[in-house]
Design a protein with these regions (language model features):
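Sec/Tat signal peptide C-region and signal peptidase I cleavage site
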Residues: 17-23
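Short helices/loops that flank or line small-molecule/ion binding pockets
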Residues: 68-82, 95-96, 126-129, 170-191
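Pocket-lining segment of extracytoplasmic ligand-binding domains
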Residues: 131-230
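Bacterial N-terminal signal peptides
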Residues: 9-17
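An extracytoplasmic/periplasmic, membrane-proximal ligand-sensing/linker region
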Residues: 24-31, 35-46, 216-218, 222-283
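Flexible hinge/capping segments at coil-to-helix
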Residues: 117-137
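Hydrophobic/proline-rich hinge and linker segments of small-molecule sensing/allosteric domains
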Residues: 102-124, 221-224
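Extracytoplasmic small-molecule ligand-binding "clamshell" domains
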Residues: 24-88
């Protein structure tokens, strides 16, 4: 009986050791699904290859089904790092108490959301009263939380102000809904809007921006708090070393819609936490 118990214990220890060894050799990375999965993977591939070179280890992109899945995976150490919106970071930080935001794009310190419509008669939110409206994901900082927060500050409660609100699930989907006439207006993050316009994926002769939110902090790359501090520091340095004057680096930065990456800290997202509490999205 004792020999069997020891054998089981040894087998468990070996399995655990192998798991930890595997985890140490592979950096598991994900991102909030604010765009189509194929687009997220396309944007990450060159960055992942760069990180592999800089870190000397395999980097694996792990897609997730929704925003809560990223929070849960980071909190349970099934992910090492993730690209998060400001609100998702707040959720992870409150859940774990130790998640670390490493870097953000330069523009994420002054991020905005764009209100769009295909109705030529809509010049402001006042013109959308009693009409239909779309947010992105309910957990999106730039596609839901912050636009909602600024609307509430202006005395607009979306649930009663609009005849119907919908959640498209992603910024590009919101633009598609508006262009197709599925809703009268919508809101999405400024970076995705600019990318869709540049790629010709939205008809600007039909869809227009009629308002922009005030600025707020948003996206960042966050690592789990239990990650080896030396590895976390290497990751941060790798991001900060991306130089737009280097053609290879610029290609990576362009896919991330970044001019460059800068350091960030948890305190930067206090305003987002306050907005989430004001909207009763945090208890």
């Amino acid at each position: 009986m004792l020999k069997r118990a020891l054998a089981i214990a040894a087998g468990f220890a070996l399995s655990l050791s192998a798991t930890l060894s595997h985890a140490a050799d592979v950096l598991k990375v994900s991102a909030i699904p604010d765009e189509a999965p194929t687009e997220l993977l396309r944007k990450f591939k060159p960055l992942g290859e760069y990180l592999e070179q800089q870190l000397g280890m395999k980097v694996e992109f792990v897609p997730v089904a929704d925003y809560p899945a990223v929070v849960e995976a980071l909190a349970t150490d099934r992910l090492d790092m993730a690209w998060l919106g400001g609100f998702t970071f707040v959720q992870v930080h409150l859940k774990t108490g130790n998640a670390i935001p490493l870097v953000q794009r330069e523009q994420d310190a002054q991020f905005t959301s764009k209100f769009i419509t295909a109705n030529p008669n809509v010049k402001s939110l006042a013109d959308l009263k009693g009409k239909t409206f779309a947010f992105g994901s309910i957990s999106s900082t730039s596609g839901s939380l912050m636009p909602r927060y600024f609307m509430l500050k202006d005395g607009i409660k979306p649930e009663t102000y609009f005849s119907r609100i919908g959640y498209s699930g992603a910024h590009d989907a919101t633009a598609a809904w508006v262009q197709a006439g599925k809703v009268d207006g919508g809101v999405l993050n400024a970076s995705v809007w600019d990318k869709l316009v540049a790629a010709g994926k939205v008809d600007t002769a039909k869809v227009k921006v009629f308002a922009t939110t005030p600025a707020y902090y948003d996206y960042n790359w966050t690592v789990r708090g239990t990650l080896d501090p030396a590895l976390a520091e290497k990751i941060k340095k790798a991001f900060l070393a991306l130089d737009p004057a280097n053609p290879q680096h610029k290609a990576i930065l362009d896919l991330q819609a970044a001019s460059r990456f800068i350091e960030t800290k948890p305190e930067n997202y206090k305003g987002i936490e306050d907005a989430a509490r004001a909207a009763d999205l945090l208890k």
